[in-house]
Amino acid sequence: DKINYLDREEIWAADETQVYYLDTAMEYSPPMACGRDMADRILEMEREGWDALCIRADTPEDGDSILQNNAHLARLPVVFLSDHPAALEAALRAYHGRAIVDSRSALDPRELGRIAARYGAVVL
């Protein structure tokens, strides 16, 4: 697997409708917990002017919450933060697009890179 670590020449993320070219100085929103209804929080983070939405995935079920109820609302790149391999994989699998994986995770960097590479995500 090719690990997609920061490539300063061409860093991008995408969702179903947009491609986002990323800047190394971008600021993530404070991590928000996954839940069935994140609409108000997502809209609040966008109004506050964050460059990307940081979503904390703590359980594999969080991936279902992202896909079923909230993914269509985000108009910013999505960053997943997780300290649990199964939760991170579920979130990346559920997300329709190329996500960012937050390198501040407590996971071993090699494991984080392998999981991100499996789903085409970029680690920043």
Show where each model-derived region lies:
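Domain-level signal for soluble alpha/beta catalytic cores
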Residues: D1-L124
